[in-house]
């Protein structure tokens, strides 16, 4: 029996309270908001089938045909034409369609019927009272791994999670693969042909450094990025410091390659979350001050090289450099362990629109560098090249998604008015003023260019 799903916001959703003593499977989901207006509602989805069986679903990623799936759910009578809550996310719509399909067959067959029609980036875990299922989209944009315990199995979005619970890594779940895990063991079914396009930003920022992706250590990748960054963007300075945590390995690599000493110039408050994934600018800016504090005795009077993982909006770096100068840094040279982020992500990262991406404002490369340098207040600014970052990952370029850096989206996006990024939020806004699902085709849906 399955006991419960624990959502990232701390919500517990019981599946069958009477079965707690016999619980054999459970799921934990911690997922950051993918839309700027996201609310701290439960991120796990729980649905009942017509037969009364509970279905719980967790989703990492973002769909690009949400409008199409929402219309299908509406046509099946699963969502009212006004689309009231709780259908507030692409995950909720998937859960509704799965539960509906399982009413006429099995949950496994419902998944095999539904998954080929779902487009976008998705790693799904879902379960009924007897079986845990896990799958990845055919492009494998997000990682998903299978682990083994003495008396059970574990599925996790990072291998570090397997280590934490004492599970041994078995293998990555393949793109286009559906796993079913029950009392008889694990069985695998292919629901689509694989076309691997793993997100390179997992190596740069999203993944924990103690995880491995496609057999490559995230920490080793970040250190190697730092070494290559030092070769591509050298500068004379007294000390290399990293912006913790994801910028630290690259800073170590930069120091190793350049011969400039590495030092810990910033202290991180371990009780503050990652600022990039906060849903609003106000919370992000407050988080920067709460999260980082300069070690004045280390940086006072020094020419600093500050290595960070990425620049998205530029707010973190602007506030950070102001803090470093106030603490006595003579010069601040910024080096970035990824290329300029110029394009929004529709596959599970909150890069919502080009207007919010600081590197997108100017197309000429040199002018862009100068504009960003001036905006964040750095003495010099350097990014690693796309080629250098890919080489550090030791993955073939053909197997990576680099859309946020070069605009080449591996999963075809639908017409601009049907993009799934904020379509559910827009639909609910329409519902509040008396419109419905049919208005998804209107020109009022937010357009991302």
Task: Show the residue positions of the predicted features.
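Short, glycine/charge-rich flexible loops or terminal/linker lids adjacent to PRPP-binding catalytic cores
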Residues: 259-304, 315, 342-352
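PRPP-dependent phosphoribosyltransferase catalytic core
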Residues: 115, 130-131, 148, 166-172, ...
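Phosphate/diphosphate-binding loops
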Residues: 161, 168, 176, 232-233, ...
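Generic beta-strand/beta-sheet core signal
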Residues: 58, 127, 135-136, 147, ...
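Secondary-structure transition/capping motifs at alpha-helix termini
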Residues: 104-105, 234-238, 256-263, 298-300, ...
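Flexible loop/turn segments at secondary-structure boundaries
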Residues: 65, 133, 141-142, 162-163, ...
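A conserved beta-strand->alpha-helix junction
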Residues: 84-88, 92-95, 262-274, 373-393
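Conserved short alpha-helical segments that host acidic/polar catalytic motifs at enzyme active sites
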Residues: 1-175, 180-237, 243, 331
């Amino acid at each position: 029996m399955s006991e419960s799903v624990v959502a990232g916001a701390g919500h517990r959703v019981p599946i069958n309270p009477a079965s707690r003593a016999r619980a054999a499977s459970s799921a934990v989901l911690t997922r950051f908001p993918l839309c700027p207006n996201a609310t701290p509602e439960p991120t796990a989805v729980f649905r009942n089938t017509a037969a009364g069986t509970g279905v719980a679903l967790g989703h990492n990623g973002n769909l690009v045909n949400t409008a199409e799936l929402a219309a299908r759910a509406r046509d099946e009578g699963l969502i009212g034409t006004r689309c009231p809550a709780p259908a507030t996310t692409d995950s909720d719509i998937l859960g509704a369609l799965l539960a509906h399909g399982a009413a006429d067959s099995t949950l496994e067959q419902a998944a095999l019927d539904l998954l080929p029609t779902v487009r976008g980036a998705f790693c799904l875990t879902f379960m009924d009272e007897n079986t845990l299922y896990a799958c990845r989209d055919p492009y494998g944009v997000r990682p998903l791994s299978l682990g083994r315990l003495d008396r059970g199995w574990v599925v996790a979005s990072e291998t570090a999670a397997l280590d934490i619970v004492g599970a041994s890594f078995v293998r990555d779940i393949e793109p286009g693969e559906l796993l079913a895990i029950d009392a008889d063991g694990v069985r695998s079914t292919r629901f689509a042909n694989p076309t691997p396009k793993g997100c390179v930003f997992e190596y740069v920022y999203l993944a924990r450094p103690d995880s491995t992706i496609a057999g490559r250590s995230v920490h080793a990748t970040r250190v190697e990025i730092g070494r290559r960054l030092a070769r591509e963007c050298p500068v004379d300075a007294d000390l290399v410091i990293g912006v913790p945590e994801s910028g630290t390995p690259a800073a170590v690599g930069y120091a190793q390659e350049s011969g400039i000493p590495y030092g810990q110039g910033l202290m991180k408050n371990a009780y503050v979350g990652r600022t990039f994934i906060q849903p609003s600018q106000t919370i992000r800016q407050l988080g920067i001050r709460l999260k980082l504090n300069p070690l004045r005795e280390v940086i006072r009077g020094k020419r600093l090289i500050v290595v960070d993982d990425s620049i998205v909006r530029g707010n973190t770096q602007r506030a950070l450099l102001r803090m470093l100068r106030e603490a006595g840094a003579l010069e601040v040279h910024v080096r970035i362990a990824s290329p300029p982020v110029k394009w929004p992500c529709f596959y599970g990262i909150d890069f919502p629109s080009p207007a919010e991406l600081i590197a997108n404002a100017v197309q000429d490369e040199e002018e862009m560098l100068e504009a960003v340098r001036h905006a964040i207040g750095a003495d010099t600014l350097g990014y690693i090249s796309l080629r250098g970052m890919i080489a550090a990952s030791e993955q073939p370029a053909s197997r990576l998604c680099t859309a946020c850096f070069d605009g080449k989206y591996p999963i075809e996006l639908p017409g601009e008015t049907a993009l799934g990024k904020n379509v559910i939020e827009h639909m609910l806004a329409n519902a509040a003023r008396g419109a419905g699902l049919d208005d998804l085709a209107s020109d009022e849906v937010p357009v991302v260019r």
